[in-house]
Amino acid sequence: MDLFYWLTVLRKKSEGLVMRISTADEVNYDTIAGPSESDIWDALVKLPVSYDSLYFTYGDKESPRFIFVEYENGKYRLEHDTEDLDTDMTNVARVSQDLARDILYHFAREHTVEIDEHWEQEKVR
């Protein structure tokens, strides 16, 4: 299956997308529920110099999914556990900043945020 196939699939889901930003000197994540495209872009740009990692989660508490993003060797390393990507694909990819942005924008558009008791445990902006 083509890598970009899932980018064209347009279906809204009721699960919420949450972005957590970690810095090397902090134990706690700064958490943003329903990050905007500008929130995601700012985090990607700052990742190589200011942040340690980005951690995106969505889904209900019975079946949460994640996308973990780190910057290493000039590429963005995305690790995922999501059924939205082709299951034949590896769950780790090293991609350019533009492709990382497109992937994360896709998830931000496709997953609406509905705060419930599962997410209320988070420090949400």
Range-by-range predicted roles:
Residues 2-125:
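Acidic, proline/glycine-rich low-complexity IDRs
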